[in-house]
Every structure is written in C-alpha cells, then in structure tokens.
Amino acid sequence: MSYLRLKKSNCKNCYKCIRHCPVKSIRFSDGQANIVEDECILCGMCFVACPQNAKQIRNDVGKAKELIASGTPVYVSIAPSFVANYDGIGITALNDALKKLGFAGAEETAEGAQLVTEQYEKLVADGEHKIIISSCCHTVNTLIQKYYPQALPYLAQVKSPMLAHGEILKKKYPGCHTVFIGPCLSKKAEADAYAGAIDCVLTFEELTGWLKEENIEVCPVSDNAGRSDRAKTRLYPTTSGILRSMNKDNPEYLYMAIDGVENCRNALRDIIDGNVGKCFIEMSACVNSCIGGPAMDKKHEGVIHERRAVDEFAGSGRFDTVELADMTKSLPFISMQKTMPGSKAIEEILRKMNKSDPSHELNCGSCGYDTCREKAVAILQGKADLTMCLPYLKEKAESFSDNIINNTPNGIMVLSEDLEVQQINKAAREIMNIKSLSDVMGCPVVRILDPVSYLEVMSTGENIHNKRTYLAEYGKYVEETIIYDKSYHIIMSIMRDITGEEISRAKREKNAAETIAVTDKVIEKQMRVVQEIASLLGETTAETKVALTKLKENLSNDEQ
C-alpha cells in the first residue's frame, strides 16, 4: 500500500530525495523518482527535502469523512505534538474544532503513552534485558526490522502510544471508530500493520487543510482542565521526552536519547558490534523527535519555541487511564527482495562510468549516493543509471564537445567579453598560422585579429553571418560568423577557410578576362573585314557579330 506518492509532472531529476533518503529506497526510471516500498522506512525525509513538492503523503481525509458519515461515533486520538503545531491551542480548543468537523470528541494520545511508560519502567526494573530500545517510533522499528535484524532482541515488544490509546478509546466508547492525528507519515503504516486499534490516520497538514476547507478557525480558549498536572507523558514528542516521563530507578542502566535516522543507525551498529553496555535507549527517527516530524505544518516557529510549548503544556504527574490486558506487540524481521551484486559486476559498472581506477572514484555525492561504489550497486539493482553521475556526464559532454570542435573543418574561437581568447580549435589555429594553443590562450584577440567586428557585435547585439573577410596578415580568405551570447558572456567566431575557393574564382575571372580580350580582337578584326565585303556577306556577318558580342557579355557576367 502506497503511503508516499509521486507527482510525476513535478519531478525535475535533481536527486535531492536520494541524497536525503537514509536507506536509498528510491528508484529512478524514465527520469522520475519512485519509492521502492519494500525498502522504505517511511521517515518522510524525501517528502520534506523535495524542492518541487513532487512527493505527496497519502491523503486520508476522505476516509475519515466516510467514518463520520457512517453514523458511528468517531473519536480522535491527538498526538501531544499538537501544541507545537498549533501555537497557543490547547486540547479544549482543538476538541471544539474537531467536533465541528463531525467527530464525537478528541482525547490525548499522551494518555496511551502513560501505559507505554509503565511498560518500559517494568522492563528496566526486571533488569533481564541488557539493552532496551524504545518502540514508540514506527520508522525506527521498521529500520531495525528491515536493516538491522540483529538488534531485534533489544527492541521493546511494547505497543506504541497510538495503538494503546486507540484501544483505550474503543474500551471507553464501545463500537466507536478511532482516528489518530499527528505529525508522522509512518503512523499510517503502523495503523494498517496492527489493525483494530486505529481506523484512520491523518497528519496535521491534512487536518489543517480540512479545517480551512470547512472555514473552521481554531480559537484559543481557557484550558484549565487541559493544564492538569496529570500529564508528564505530554513530553513524549520531544527528544528525551520518554526518558523524562519515566521513573529511572534502576542505577544499573544508562538512559540515553538518540534522534535522527543516521544517529540511530550508528547506535544500532554499535549495539550489534557489542560496544554498548546496559542501557535504555529512546530512539526517534526525526531530529528533535516528533516535533520535527515530516507532516508538521510547514510554518514552523523553531525548535526552541516548539520545545517550550510542549514543556509548558506538560505536567509532572501521570494520567489516570484505563488499563489494557495486553500491551505487547510483535516486531518480526521483515525480509526484502534485495540482491547484492558481486565485485566483478561492480567493477564493470565503474568502468562504464570511466572509473577504472580507485582514484577516479570522486564520491562527490551529486547523484545522491555517498560513494561511487554504492551508486554502482544501485545501477545493478535497477535503482539508478549511468546518467545520474554528474562528473561522468560532464566528462562525456566535454569529450563529445571537444571531438566536435577539434575535428570540424571550420575554425572556432571563443572570446570573453574582454575580447580575450578562451578557446580556439585546431582548424582556427591553422588558419592563423598559430603553432601552439598556449601561444594565444588568455591573450587579447587584437594580437591575432582586427577586433572591430567583435566590438560591433557586442555593442549592437546583432550577430554577423557569413561575412567574407581577407586576413591579409595570414594571406587567407574566410567566411566568418560572429555570435554574441549574453547569457554566457562570450563571443564565438566560426570561420570557414575559403582561400581555395577565392583562388579558383580569381583564376576563373582571369580566364574570362583573357577570353573577352580575345573575343574583342576577333570582333574588331571581323568588323574590318565586313566593311570590305559587307555587300557580299550581308546578314551572315551581322549574325556572327551578335553571337560574339553575346559571348562577351556572358563572360563578363560570369566575371562579376
């Protein structure tokens, strides 16, 4: 089931989503980014990073409306990060707004978090587990299940606050439907994976859009009830929030909080390598935990402001809540259909990328992958292609361009706006009898050519096409086109050596002139003769004169 969708028309092939995806679960095909669902951990980083808004979180507002329309009461479990998302709004105000949308009521997910905290405290008190990793974050759970299964024994088999609160609501209001609203994309997947507790998941962005659609404004109200002291678990959406809600009574355990996928991955590697002692680890995929979630409204006030809002809304006590018979949940290994290619295949791909030597592996990351070898593996797995390598494309384009420039029979010269030579090909150097490229590179063009035409093109903005010029200093005739590219601040000259053509034309003109001179003599001599025998030859002589005169005119025209 797709939780992240692509808006194909928006994707511009910038690879930013790959750069930000911690597990590289993105496949590029036909110039479009596609999520590889069985590899994705639903962290939402590609959604946040995409500058073109080409990634979309599945919208479930329609499903929530259907639940309301069914006539069965629908209760909302609202994530404690709502106070960071909706500035100055408490649970009472939000409850009023949600009722206007048709919900039966809204209660805090932090109530379910109370049961989760109690389960974590029991695990620590038992002391049977060397390492305990919190299991509230579904993205962290998925990361471990797919990529670090060796750490599964350390992952607490405890329901998340969302699942626990969904069950609490269904116990309090038998037969009701439940909708969770929070800042997290992966909660949609968790609700589907553990069906029964939560019937629908909305993000804060979805809720905000729905409220605007219905012209419902969330107005601050007096919230004395909402500020009850029984609310320590409202701290959950901040880094160390779980730890701050716990009684840390076992001195044998070290308590630590880790946020951000990369930090979590590093910690998991340390755990698997046996470098970690007895500890309880709170893990959150999002930097700053849930208040840094991908589906928080984009109008963030800043982490300090949001952290303060959560702290001020929280209390130091505990919720009085309904007890659940079973707080455990299964977190099995998730197998992925992913094959690792052999070293020979990787070397072959690197060779095709013009990286036959390790020194050629720049590891620049422009393709989105951290190393060239990682990119080669992705190509072999069908997730990437050669054209995603910027240095490769640049080298290929330059090679192609150089081949064209250096093998064309036309002379090509590129000047800066200061009329200094930036590039000149072999054909142009031959035209101007220049032995070495270094003799002219960076030099003023006035050293080799009259700059008047180049200055004219720059001042008028009008290009010159096929202008015939005699380069007296080189004894060459050229047909020159001069183009001024303002966007790149260059002047380009394309010269065609027409010296051979001019020499041939001069020979033809000379031959024509000689033929005309001979014709004139013939005509003159003929006319003297016809004066003597005009009466005998008559019309025939006149016709001869006309023919010769016409020949002369034709030759003259050819000369012109």
Language-model segments: residues:
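Sensory modules in modular signal-transduction proteins
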Residues: 396-430
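PAS/PAS-like sensory domain cap-loop motif
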Residues: 428-440
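Signal-transducing coiled-coil/dimerization helices and immediately adjacent hinge/linker segments
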Residues: 510-560
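Sensory coupling linkers of modular signal transduction proteins
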Residues: 484-529
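Short, charged amphipathic alpha-helical "coupling" segments at sensory-output junctions
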Residues: 386, 390-407, 504-511, 522
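Iron-sulfur cluster-binding cysteine motifs and their immediate structural context
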Residues: 3-8, 12-37, 41, 45-60, ...
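PAS-family sensory/regulatory modules and their coupling/dimerization elements
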Residues: 450-500
